[in-house]
Curated annotation (Swiss-Prot):
Lineage: Eukaryota, Metazoa, Ecdysozoa, Nematoda, Chromadorea
Family statement: Belongs to the protein kinase superfamily. CMGC Ser/Thr protein kinase family. CDC2/CDKX subfamily.
Name of the protein in question: Cyclin-dependent kinase 11.1
Family annotation (SMART domains): S_TKc
Domain Protein kinase: start-end pairs: 356-647
Function summary: Probable cyclin-dependent kinase whose activity is most likely regulated by the cyclin cyl-1/Cylin-L. Important for normal oocyte and sperm development; probably required during multiple stages of gametogenesis. Plays a role in the activation of RAS-ERK signaling in the germ line. Also acts partially redundantly with cdk-11.2 to ensure embryonic viability.
Gene: cdk-11.1
Tissue: Broadly expressed in somatic and germ line cells (at protein level). Not expressed in sperm (at protein level).
Length: 719
């Protein structure tokens, strides 16, 4: 068919009959065509007729392309384009379906899918063994179709999103290439991707097809670009302006010399209208003048006015001056504080003991030696307790840790000594604990009063016992047992404040009770249940010690001074009476009671000792007897003792500030004996002027001069 048509093309023009014959000849060569081939033939026939009509018009006159297309049959070209577009759309759909089945994606998407499957395989290792085997067996026997379905199911959500994105892109391309929307001369996409059959007829009928084909390819390259080609627009000129006033950058500069100040003249400013420049400059000038006025007003209050100026001021000016004076004082204080070196315990650790000056040694206890020290920075007097570390070869002593922990927990009370900080010496064996310094310990004070035959008054006894019970109540509410209450662990300041110290044996207790060791508390203040070997105890052991301390406040000596545990329990039973099951239920079950046999002493002989000597009245003796009850369950608690009527009857407790002061042994400030004092006074009075002048040159006081045992005497007559 192509040869025949080609020969007719050389003859000049084809007739309708020759065209029909050629069509019949071509149709006769083909075997029985289907219905779809008839449709294709009709389309081809229409296209050939349209091209023949174009050929005739082009030979008849030299009209333009628009004029030649105007004589076409009605809607013929549009129908042709619609058919081409429908076919192309069907082909694209089939191609997309094939791509979805074959998983045609980019390398990044395939790598993500492989990573996702790898994560699934790694997570599968944590499953049970039988589930893994079952899954492996299932995959071993599955068919290729099952594998395909499973791979499709295992695709990640990213593939679905990519598929959706491709669908949207295809929709956008189809919408942008429609002839109704694209009327621009640059967008002739309706002639792109023409089917092969149509290109065949173009090649036959048009001798200039090759040139047109090249043009079409160029158009395709332009139209396939996703970026819309816009017409070039002329760029608008940017208006620049600068502010000539020096107020701009310097007003808001944070530093005296701005690093960018050298480039302010050349740096472009924000675009704006020229008529707005004057407004900007006026605003900046107003701000500068307002600030200058404010500074000048503040300068008036920088100095304290004199008396004459103060009297001439109004009330408002005086008030402003007072506020300025307060502000200057606070700023001065802040400046002084800022000059001090900052100490961060969490970053810098503990301070060194060299920052304290050791004044003198105070006492030595079970767990350390106590010194009186002075802070070199603040001149504050503190108590420095050096912890004993001789036997600690494997770290910090547990007793010291307990003491620090208990003091930090219970130290927020006026009747409990407060720890300030932990200090380190030259090595780790020298660890100190800085606590508030209290001048007296009650043991030394009671001994001094006993030697001088002096006693506390009843009001003073009530004050001391009330403060002791207040501190004990605070500890017991925090579930803390002191377990070593005695007069040497009670401190008293010059202001009459009693404080509880030495928490080396303190422990926390709970409910139900824990088993503790029974070898606690100094022997003279140890409760009978501890002496009999019980290990389940709580606050009553401290209250027994409080009863012994109350009796010592009155007697100025210990109540039960035993020399051993057997003698101690015997002394207790002699004064309080031998207990029975009716007096103390459960006493016969204690280990000490089972191991020993005790004599039967009459019940409670303390009445004769305190009442007969008129040391206590009946109310006070009831309180003492309640604190020294043998049965720990019936013994008074700290709250019950504080609520006792003995503290509310006359004589009332003496206020702490009215307590008498005593010379503190810890301060070592005893006055010299009278004989030595007179001798020093005589020595100072008999100093001759020349010796006094010499001592002044050497900055030596006369009382510091000690007479020597040997001196040379010269006879003035010989010289």
């Amino acid at each position: 068919m192509s040869d025949h048509l080609g020969s007719s093309h050389d003859e000049g023009e084809l007739s309708d009959e020759s065209h029909k014959k050629s069509q019949r000849a071509s149709s006769s060569d083909e075997p029985n065509p289907a219905k779809s081939n008839k449709g294709l033939e009709s389309k081809m026939r229409e296209s050939i007729l349209s091209r023949l009509s174009k050929r005739k018009n082009s030979e008849s006159d030299d009209d333009t392309t628009e004029q030649r297309f105007s004589i076409q049959p009605k809607n013929a070209q549009k129908a042709k384009e619609d058919r081409y577009r429908d076919k192309e759309r069907d082909k694209k759909r089939e191609k997309d379906k094939r791509d979805d089945r074959r998983d045609v994606r980019g390398p990044d998407a395939r790598q993500k899918d492989r990573d996702f499957k790898g994560r699934q395989e790694r997570s599968g290792r944590d499953q049970k063994v039988h589930e893994h085997r079952h899954h492996h067996h299932h995959r071993k026997h599955e068919t290729d179709g099952h594998r395909t379905n499973r791979s499709n199911r295992d695709r990640s959500s990213e593939r679905d999103s990519e598929k959706h994105k491709r669908h949207i892109d295809r929709h956008k391309k189809s919408s942008t290439t429609s002839p109704d929307n694209d009327k621009s001369p640059h967008k002739k996409s309706k002639h792109t991707d023409v089917p092969a059959d149509a290109k065949l007829f173009d090649r036959i009928l048009d001798p200039n097809y090759k040139k047109k084909d090249d043009d079409v390819l160029v158009i395709e390259d332009v139209e396939m670009s996703p970026i819309e080609i816009l017409e070039e627009k002329e760029e608008k000129e940017i208006v620049e302006f600068t502010i000539d006033s020096p107020a701009g950058p310097k007003k808001y500069s944070k530093f005296e010399s701005d690093p960018e100040s050298d480039h302010d003249d050349t740096k472009p400013k924000s675009p704006g209208k020229a008529e707005d420049d004057d407004d900007v400059i006026e605003v900046l000038d107003d701000a500068l003048h307002s600030d200058d006025d404010a500074d000048s007003d503040e300068d008036k209050y920088l100095k304290t006015p004199e008396d004459r100026e103060w009297e001439e001021m109004t009330e408002t000016e005086q008030r402003l001056h007072k506020e300025a004076m307060k502000k200057r004082a606070s700023m001065k204080q802040k400046t002084l504080i800022a000059q001090l070196p900052v100490f961060y315990p969490g970053l810098m650790g503990c301070r060194n003991i060299d920052e304290y000056e050791c004044v003198n040694r105070v006492d030595e206890g079970t767990f350390g030696v106590v010194y009186r020290g002075k802070d070199k920075r603040t001149d504050e007097i503190v108590a420095l307790k050096r912890l004993k570390m001789e036997k600690e070869k494997e770290g910090f002593p547990i007793t010291a840790l307990r003491e620090i922990n208990m003091l930090l927990k219970a130290g927020n009370h006026p009747n409990i000594v407060n720890v300030k900080e932990i200090l380190l010496g030259s090595n780790m064996d020298k660890i100190y604990m800085a606590m508030e310094f209290v001048e007296h310990d009650m043991k030394s004070l009671l001994d001094t009063m006993s030697r001088r035959n002096k006693r506390f008054s009843i009001g003073e006894q009530k004050t001391l016992l009330q403060q002791l019970l207040s501190g004990i109540e605070h500890m017991h509410k925090l579930w803390i047992l002191h377990r070593d209450l005695k007069t040497s662990n009670l401190l008293m300041s010059h202001k009459g404040i009693l404080k509880i110290a030495d928490f080396g044996l303190a422990r926390e207790y709970g409910d139900p009770l824990k088993k503790f060791t029974s070898i606690v508390v100094t022997l003279w203040y140890r409760s009978p249940e501890l002496l009999l070997g019980t290990r389940l105890y709580s606050t009553p052991v401290d209250m027994w010690s409080v009863g012994c301390i109350m009796a010592e406040f009155i007697l100025l000596k210990p109540l039960f001074p035993g020399r051993g545990e057997l003698e101690q329990i015997k002394k207790i039973f002699m004064e309080m009476g031998t207990p029975t099951e009716s007096i103390w239920p459960g006493v016969t079950e204690l280990d000490g009671w089972k191991a020993l046999t005790f004599e039967k002493y009459p019940y409670n002989q303390l009445r004769k000792r305190f009442l007969a000597g008129r040391l206590l009245n009946d109310t006070g003796f009831k309180l003492l007897n309640g604190l020294l009850t043998l049965d720990p369950k019936n013994r008074f608690s700290a709250t019950q003792a504080l609520d006792h009527e003995w503290f509310t009857e006359e004589p009332y407790p003496v206020p702490p500030e009215e307590f008498p002061t005593f010379p503190a042994k810890s301060e070592q400030n005893k006055a010299p004996p009278p004989a030595k004092q007179k001798q020093q006074e005589n020595r100072i009075s008999h100093v001759d002027p020349e010796t006094a002048k010499l001592l002044k040159q050497f900055e030596v006081r006369p009382e510091q001069v000690k007479p020597g045992g040997f001196s040379l005497k010269f006879d003035p007559t010989r010289f």
